[in-house]
Amino acid sequence: SMWSNLKYALDKMGYNPGERLVSILTMAHMYGLAFELIYPFASGTHVYFISKTPAPKIINEIFSAVRPNLIVAVPLIIEKIIKHRVLPQLEKFHIKLFLKIPYLNRRLRLSIRDKIVNAFGGRFKLIAIGGAALNFEVEKFLSSVQFPYTVGYGMTECGPAISYDDWHTFKAGSCGKAVDRMEIAINSSDPENIVGEIL
């Protein structure tokens, strides 16, 4: 399954030699090991390791200095940045007012997206999120500003990716589609329409 995940990443994620990735996740976790060490190593991506606890302030400093092309993260990191730095700004009276005007709404949302992209270094292709469920409020916001993110699902025993989708085709609220060479069954009386556990 490690080989299958590596082949999938090399075939579908499209990162090139010399591009940059900041390693936020622990190497003791399969998600971090696979997608912040093995995949970047195989694709020739430069990996920058954070030697401190990845607090939002430290992450912001490192992203500004390294300007990564790929960001692999757990939801907690993204949620902290969005909940503490972005969502409070949207509660201001004039911002709420502008968001109710169709033309200004779109322009303001694109401006907000650009600011968030810059907060993550300004040149990444996407943020791949996994390891836990993404907060609904944060995901709804990211989708509304057309932020380049995707959410995958996996477990250690599967090497670790089970599902993933490119951010252009990713549907908010999902965890992507089954990765190549992976078979998935949903434990549900109606797996097409009723939520169930992935087996």
For every predicted segment, state its role:
Residues I71, L108-L199:
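Conserved AMP-binding/adenylate-forming
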Residues W3-R20, M27-K115:
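Conserved AMP-binding/adenylation subdomain of ANL enzymes
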Residues R20-S23, L199:
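Short, well-ordered beta-strand segments
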Residues I24-M27, A42, A133, G152:
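Alpha-helical architecture
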Residues S23, S64, L99, K125, ...:
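A near-ubiquitous, low-amplitude feature marking generic local secondary-structure context
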